[in-house]
Amino acid sequence: MEPVRKVEGKALPLGYSDVDTDQIVPSDALKRIERTGFGRFLFAEWREDPDFVLNKPEHQGAVVLIAGENFGCGSSREHAVWAVQDYGFGAVIAPSFADIFKNNCTKNGVLTVELPKETVRRLLEAVREDPEATVTVDLESRTVKGPGVETTFEIDDFVRYRLLNGLDDVGLTLRHEEDIERFERSRPRYMPRVL
């Protein structure tokens, strides 16, 4: 996993609340066995509407997704995070997230930022008015800056540490590889081994 320090660029003003994982990536896309290539399935059903915000040329290349409350609700579907990330989003800003989706984002290097509903509304309006506006999510300083918005956000210290250092679950485990090997060498031969 790559470290996440700052996500800066254009933002996609989605703004919908209660977007579930089935809306983020349809179930028929889950048959794939690779983690890449899911970006083309992001909001697939909604993208059939030519007026859907993701289809607008002015929002192409956005790296920050701005959503409504309870983003990522529904079934636990890590593919939803893969679709968000594979499309090019490094951060998602919303008033709230479904817990499982938020945890899956952390484990895959996507920064989730919870801001007050009114702040998200102002940011959405500003980006809709000026699609070229830059939004900056700085994990090191725990700040979000955009047109008319400059604020701090809270994030769990351990989550922040993981993201800043690019540590997924495997990366965290490998940080203790020597300790694990030392423990395995010290175990009597008649004890079970981890392979």
Curated annotation (Swiss-Prot):
<dbReference type="InterPro" id="IPR004431">
    <property type="entry name" value="3-IsopropMal_deHydase_ssu"/>
</dbReference>
<dbReference type="InterPro" id="IPR050075">
    <property type="entry name" value="LeuD"/>
</dbReference>
<dbReference type="GO" id="GO:0009098">
    <property type="term" value="P:L-leucine biosynthetic process"/>
</dbReference>
<dbReference type="GO" id="GO:0003861">
    <property type="term" value="F:3-isopropylmalate dehydratase activity"/>
</dbReference>
<comment type="similarity">
    <text>Belongs to the LeuD family. LeuD type 1 subfamily.</text>
</comment>
<dbReference type="InterPro" id="IPR015928">
    <property type="entry name" value="Aconitase/3IPM_dehydase_swvl"/>
</dbReference>
<keyword id="KW-0456">Lyase</keyword>
<comment type="subunit">
    <text>Heterodimer of LeuC and LeuD.</text>
</comment>
<dbReference type="Pfam" id="PF00694">
    <property type="entry name" value="Aconitase_C"/>
</dbReference>
<dbReference type="InterPro" id="IPR033940">
    <property type="entry name" value="IPMI_Swivel"/>
</dbReference>
<comment type="pathway">
    <text>Amino-acid biosynthesis; L-leucine biosynthesis; L-leucine from 3-methyl-2-oxobutanoate: step 2/4.</text>
</comment>
<keyword id="KW-0100">Branched-chain amino acid biosynthesis</keyword>
<protein>
    <recommendedName>
        <fullName>3-isopropylmalate dehydratase small subunit</fullName>
        <ecNumber>4.2.1.33</ecNumber>
    </recommendedName>
</protein>
<keyword id="KW-0028">Amino-acid biosynthesis</keyword>
<dbReference type="GO" id="GO:0009316">
    <property type="term" value="C:3-isopropylmalate dehydratase complex"/>
</dbReference>
<comment type="function">
    <text>Catalyzes the isomerization between 2-isopropylmalate and 3-isopropylmalate, via the formation of 2-isopropylmaleate.</text>
</comment>
<dbReference type="InterPro" id="IPR000573">
    <property type="entry name" value="AconitaseA/IPMdHydase_ssu_swvl"/>
</dbReference>
<keyword id="KW-0432">Leucine biosynthesis</keyword>
